[in-house]
């Protein structure tokens, strides 16, 4: 960077206010109803993001701003949109008996798929099936919360396709199979503990709290599985292939400093073509049967625009004022804590840069950092994204779809107090103590 601008601490205020808006506005009477409209979320994002953008341009940080919006936000949204549109065109219909075992199996399948089709892809593929399965149950919220943790986050640890921070670490030079070779233990133990806890919780609710009439309706209305829109399996594979192969590793010109912007965004152009292809080749009735709506992805786009812009000075502030951490366990919790409130992909990059300043053994280094730091950063970025609704893109989408289907989801703070801090965090601490 030719011109170094020191970020004052007060430039973190817009980002903090953005987070507070997401957390608090839905709880305020009347204001909560106003906040429900995506256009109003966009207004808030623009209100907070525009002054930040003006300040960055005035202080010769336009390069950082452009990079944050064009090369971070747009690819982030287009990848999520490509996965949302393709998986939203695969309709898995059926109302299975919503027993604890059935629900646990659905969660387990999503957990296994997440590393290979992305947490967003797996979540969007299975969330509607899960909601249809549990629709006769009175107590449904806990199932959606565990779905967010297991499928939309923790399942994506085994490959760069699983979660954006791992893809960026892959771009930094981590071998594609490194996570599969080195982090299966963390993936297995975390997933197994979450599935076991869910099965115990759902079994208790099923046998002791569910009204008999709800259980009888669930049995009476159960039906067989049916799938339609299978052309979207092809389009989903195209998304996976584009994510894996259309990058500067395989197309070096994309990484050249003076390459045209449209060359650098070649993967994103491909995503747009895939979105159009999926939309055109999918029968309209399939999406109707799937209760398809643009609302969830539009909510993510509007909210995360404000997050990405106001987050730019916050990330630069962290780069200029690195945290004094030197131990692997510290990287787990520092990366994890910030990933819960910042986007986990750029957060992983910040801590990769921090780790790269520490002494390493060149013979064992992974992407320029010690292997134990790579494991810690990966675990913190992927797992801790489940601690809040904004920690990972799919969280908001799952929440929005569930609310569209009449499930009353917890507030921002309610999610943390009633679920993530008392269920997820203890499990993460156990896994960290075992492996890192």
Locate the predicted segments by residue.
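Intrinsically disordered, low-complexity non-transmembrane regions of multi-pass membrane transporters
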Residues: 1-11, 15-21, 25-29, 46-51, ...
């Amino acid at each position: 960077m030719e011109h170094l601008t020191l970020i004052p601490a007060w430039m973190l205020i817009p980002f903090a206010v953005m987070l507070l808006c997401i957390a608090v506005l839905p709880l305020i009477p009347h204001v909560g109803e106003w906040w429900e409209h995506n256009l109003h979320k966009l207004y808030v994002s623009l209100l907070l993001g525009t002054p930040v953008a003006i300040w960055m341009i005035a202080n010769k940080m336009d390069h950082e701003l452009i990079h944050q919006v064009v090369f971070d936000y747009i690819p982030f949204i287009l990848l999520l949109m490509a996965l949302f549109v393709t998986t939203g065109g695969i309709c898995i219909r059926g109302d299975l008996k919503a027993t604890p075992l059935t629900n646990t199996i659905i969660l387990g399948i999503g957990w296994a798929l997440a590393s290979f089709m992305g947490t967003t892809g797996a979540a969007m593929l299975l969330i509607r099936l899960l909601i249809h399965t549990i629709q006769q149950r009175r107590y449904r919220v806990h199932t959606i919360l565990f779905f967010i943790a297991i499928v939309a986050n923790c399942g994506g640890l085994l490959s760069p396709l699983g979660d954006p921070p791992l893809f960026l670490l892959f771009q930094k030079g981590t071998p594609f199979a490194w996570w599969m070779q080195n982090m299966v233990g963390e993936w297995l133990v975390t997933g197994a503990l979450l599935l076991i806890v869910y099965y115990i919780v759902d079994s208790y609710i099923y046998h002791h709290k569910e009204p008999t009439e709800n259980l009888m309706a669930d049995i009476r209305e159960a039906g067989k599985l049916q799938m339609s829109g299978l052309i979207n399996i092809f389009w989903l594979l195209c998304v996976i292939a584009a994510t894996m192969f259309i990058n500067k590793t395989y197309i070096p010109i994309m990484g050249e400093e003076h390459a045209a912007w449209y060359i650098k965004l070649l993967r994103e152009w491909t995503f747009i073509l895939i979105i159009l292809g999926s939309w055109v080749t999918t029968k309209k009735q399939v999406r109707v049967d799937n209760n398809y709506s643009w609302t969830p992805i539009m909510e993510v786009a509007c909210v995360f625009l404000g997050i990405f812009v106001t987050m730019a000075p916050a990330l630069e502030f962290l780069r200029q004022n690195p945290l004094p951490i030197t131990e692997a366990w510290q990287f787990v919790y520092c990366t994890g804590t910030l990933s819960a409130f910042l986007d986990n992909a750029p957060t992983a990059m910040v801590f990769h840069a921090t780790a790269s300043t520490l002494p390493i053994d060149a013979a064992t280094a992974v992407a320029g950092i010690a292997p134990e730091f790579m494991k810690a950063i990966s675990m913190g970025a992927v797992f801790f994204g489940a601690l809040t609704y904004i920690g990972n893109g799919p969280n908001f989408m799952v929440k929005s779809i569930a609310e569209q289907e009449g499930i009353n989801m917890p507030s921002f703070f309610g999610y943390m107090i009633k679920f993530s801090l008392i269920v997820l965090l203890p499990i993460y601490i156990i896994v960290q103590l075992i492996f890192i």
